[in-house]
């Protein structure tokens, strides 16, 4: 288990799946903002994007637990991990009741520590919708810098929207 100030990142359990699925996948508006594929109904089970999966070199998937009460707060992951080039992408998704209280900032910080200090990665990247200011603030708190804008690169609820690309190198990272 990886601990921050407010959260812990732990392995996904079967008990997490229905909660994450109900609150993160079934919220069509939120899910369509977080996924590059169109939303479609999926039963909460093995087809769920939150199902427990075998460990892989290409992704590190965590459940986010709030330390104050042990409650499941959401999911966090390093995805598209490339061990040769030592790069990966960060993704987080918090349950609605756990947003806006600083957990995302702590999640990003713990993922950075895992990526740089444990995996020995060299670069992390985040792509987020341009209006997702909370994610941008959380990333910049850990040292990420805005590297550019991908204009009209995401199709979200009947319109094209911009994405912001943020990056962080191991040499720029400050361990907190």
Regions found by a protein language model. Give the residues of each.
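Compositionally biased, low-complexity repeat tracts
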Residues: 41-43, 54, 70, 144
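A generic alpha-helix structural signal
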Residues: 21, 50-51
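Acyl-donor (CoA/ACP) binding surface of acyl/acetyltransferases
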Residues: 1-27, 61, 65-176
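Conserved GNAT-fold acetyl-CoA-binding loop/helix
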Residues: 28-50
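A short helix-loop-beta-strand connector motif used in the catalytic cores of GNAT acetyltransferases and
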Residues: 51-63
